[in-house]
């Protein structure tokens, strides 16, 4: 099984504060990997490192075959990334956004044109073609942002709280898109604060105070910790850490 992310003893410090404390895990091709943790748990710091935006204090990190210390620029060019703010330009049209990001990733005009036609048809955006992104419903913005994040067919895409603020039906539709992308062999690395969404992942890790306190499939973790839901497990881990 191809490994797209390999992390070994990752430590990130800010002065005396340890944001990431000896993190070790692997993520595989075509896997949907949930990266869970409360605000301040350290997951955002770790994601910045995995995306090539920051260096670790120590430890080994490889993403898509590239070393974080030597190949940060290559990592940035070979991953997809979607933030909860969607990273779209509201004053540009749909086609202009696709053209802009396709150009950043070095795609040819022919490929960009083909992708534009494909996305407009897939999302039913014919009536919005000449209108700015700001005119789009939130759910459609979300789906378009995801498609643009994988326009260059990266081995891995990072999704940072991608379903924040959308209704349950749109969330479900978005997850269908995630499954379709994973079926193509793309690794999907996702953070979410919706504990029910964790159940949709192949495996999840749960961070508490800078450490990974649980790692495995949702079923494995619920069985191991004797909980009915991932939310119960999350609360249990937080309480255990606080009591210790």
Stretch-by-stretch model annotation:
Residues 59-70, 74-75:
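Conserved ABC transporter NBD signature motif
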Residues 99, 103, 110-128:
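Conserved ABC ATPase "signature" region
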Residues 157-161:
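Catalytic Walker B motif of ABC-type/P-loop ATPase nucleotide-binding domains
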Residues 215-216:
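ABC ATPase "signature
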């Amino acid at each position: 099984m191809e490994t797209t992310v390999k992390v070994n003893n990752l430590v990130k410090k800010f002065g005396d504060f340890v944001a990431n404390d000896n993190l070790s895990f692997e993520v595989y091709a075509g896997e949907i990997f949930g990266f869970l943790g409360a605000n301040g748990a350290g997951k955002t710091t770790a994601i910045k490192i995995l995306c090539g935006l920051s260096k670790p204090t120590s430890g080994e990190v490889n993403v898509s075959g590239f070393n974080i210390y030597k190949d940060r620029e290559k990592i940035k060019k070979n991953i997809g990334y979607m933030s909860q703010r969607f990273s779209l330009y509201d004053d540009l049209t749909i086609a202009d956004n696709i053209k802009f990001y396709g150009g950043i990733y070095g795609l040819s005009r022919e490929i960009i044109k083909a992708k534009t036609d494909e996305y407009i048809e897939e999302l039913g955006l014919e009536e919005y073609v000449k209108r700015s992104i700001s005119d789009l419903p939130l759910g459609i913005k979300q789906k378009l942002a995801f498609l643009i994040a994988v326009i260059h067919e990266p081995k891995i895409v990072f999704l940072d709280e991608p379903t924040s603020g959308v209704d349950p039906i749109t969330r479900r539709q978005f997850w269908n898109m995630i499954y379709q992308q994973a079926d193509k062999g793309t690794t999907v690395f996702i953070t979410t604060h919706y504990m029910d969404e964790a159940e949709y992942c192949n495996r999840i890790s749960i961070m508490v105070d800078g450490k990974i306190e649980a790692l495995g499939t949702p079923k494995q973790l619920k069985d191991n910790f004797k909980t009915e839901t991932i939310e119960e497990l999350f609360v249990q881990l937080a309480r255990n850490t606080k009591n210790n």
